[in-house]
């Protein structure tokens, strides 16, 4: 099951990037249209910072997914490591982006039929697949600490 998981992680990571990106787009649309205290919600400094952090996280996650896909394409021995790294990064990015969406939409973000709530739920469920975050962190830490890697049978990637 563990070996199957390393091939599923890049695909799941790509899905998480899509969820995060959709959540951010929807949040930006709402937050630029909604006026509070005379200006769009998105233009309030704290909210703008949250949107910027979500955007940066999504971009970083997308890059790690590309690295993982390239490692698999080249049949590199550390492809499993990069797949797990991609999994961790994208789960974090999806959580941040969907959480920002729920926060900035206020009460609308908690309505069960609203896209913000749906995206948050999707991101959380996806994060539980393939052993969850703890299993992924255990795999990555084994490589980073050079104590063996259950994913690749190698040490730390160069």
Model-predicted regions and their roles:
Residues 4-158:
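Alpha-helical interface subdomain recognition
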């Amino acid at each position: 099951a563990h070996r199957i998981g390393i091939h599923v992680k890049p695909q799941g990571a790509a899905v998480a990037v899509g969820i995060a990106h959709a959540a951010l787009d929807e949040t930006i649309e709402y937050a630029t249209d909604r006026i509070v205290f005379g200006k769009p919600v998105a233009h309030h400094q704290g909210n703008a910072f949250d949107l910027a952090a979500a955007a940066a996280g999504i971009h970083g996650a997308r890059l790690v997914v590309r690295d993982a896909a390239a490692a698999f394409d080249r049949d590199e021995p550390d492809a499993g490591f990069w797949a797990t790294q991609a999994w961790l990064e994208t789960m974090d990015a999806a959580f941040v982006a969907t959480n920002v969406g729920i926060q900035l939409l206020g009460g609308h973000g908690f309505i069960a039929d609203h896209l913000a709530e749906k995206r948050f739920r999707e991101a959380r469920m996806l994060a539980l697949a393939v052993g969850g975050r703890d299993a992924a962190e255990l795999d990555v830490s084994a490589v980073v600490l050079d104590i063996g890697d259950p994913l690749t049978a190698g040490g730390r990637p160069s």
